[in-house]
Amino acid sequence: MPSLRETLNGHVAGGHELELVLPRFDPFSDDAKPLTIPDGQPFSVYFAPCRWLPLFKKVRYAARRLGNNDSVPYVLRWLLNVFMLLALTVSLTLAARRVRHHGFTSQLVYAHNQYAALSGFLVSRLWKVPNVTRLYGTFLADLMKKPLVSLRYPTAAAGYLVPSDLLICANDGTRGDEVAQKFGVSGQRFRFWQNGVEPPSTPPDLSRKELVARFAALNPDTSWALSCSRLSYWKRIDRMLQALAVCRRQNVACQLIVAGDGPERDNLIALAKKLNLGDAVVWLGAVAHDDIWALMNTADVFLLTNDVTNRCNPLYEAAWAGLPVVSVSDFSTADLLKHRHNALLSEADDAETLGAHLVELCQDDALRHQLSMAQKELSKTFWSWEERMRVEVAELETLVHASFDDGQRG
């Protein structure tokens, strides 16, 4: 998760010592393999055993098979989510206490996402230090007018309702600020920040020929349309495949390069086969970040067709690389993407227009250059991750100093 990685690195760059407590298994995937962290991290990692998680994953998988479209029925989903919240709270809290027992003294507890919020609060009160909750988006904005939202979606609401000294919510287009306001979160302890962009330390200099040598399925003689996202249903990669089918019908040589992996991979490959797209789709799987930058600097078009929000790190990076965008009209990007200024936009489910826009950018060099220049201008308004984290670290240091002063007076 790039934003988590950059946050941790930013805290270390600010001169602070970190002890990261993680569940031994990824609670959000069905994979039963233990998590592994690459060596050489600038922080220490302690794993909470969470021996209950492998069995929980099996139960959740079985529950999913009971629903339609491979989704867990609502009542079962509610029970599973609440159980996971409470079980993670116990596991993470006990693990944090063991970390303390081993000699680590914390001046602040930072909980990443709603499932860690309650544990972060409990640990901070045990240790008498401030606590911060960090949320990476929400789906609650359109549900807030309905009754009993916090009861119907307790885990999603927990990030806002569990007490914290500072609540940081990503400005990712999911309108977390509206949710915070409706839950009565004080503006004094709420921060709504857009993620930063971390360009490569040196500009990518890989040519198309070199990328073809690295990724053999690439065709250097076609236009390249790039997608960078996890292959989840709400990312709607199927819309891109439908748009690519329009290109094929109009005999426009274009390859869709899909950088990313996820649970929808098999379904998407089946759809591509049904649409007779053949080698027009290149499934790269997970790709190193430096290679993403190289692809962005050699591709012709960036495709983004999400359902929930299209305001995301890959969009910022595409702007930084000057890559023209073909996307869907979306209120979350209304201030970033302007039709025929730096992007071509269609209605969400208008595959024909989406495809026509892809065809147009593949064929019109002048339009592509115009949109590229506008993208580079837009990128000048973005924070780098270094700038974004300097602001956050300053806030955290202020919080710690205020807590220390209060303790001295007490």
Task: Indicate where each model-derived feature is located.
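Aromatic "clamp/platform" in nucleotide-sugar-dependent glycosyltransferases that forms part
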Residues: 307
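N-terminal subdomain of nucleotide-sugar transferases
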Residues: 1-49, 104, 404-409
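Conserved acidic donor-binding segment of nucleotide-sugar-dependent glycosyltransferases
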Residues: 339-340, 344-351, 360-365
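Short alpha-helical donor nucleotide-sugar binding micro-motif in glycosyltransferases
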Residues: 286-287, 294-299
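Short hydrophobic beta-strand element within catalytic cores of glycosyltransferases
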Residues: 324-327
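A short, active-site helix/loop in glycosyltransferases that binds the activated sugar's phosphate group
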Residues: 160-201
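Conserved donor-binding/catalytic core segment of Leloir-type glycosyltransferases
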Residues: 168, 217-235, 241-244
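Membrane-proximal helix-turn-helix segments that form the acceptor-binding/catalytic region
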Residues: 5-9, 93, 97-100, 139, ...
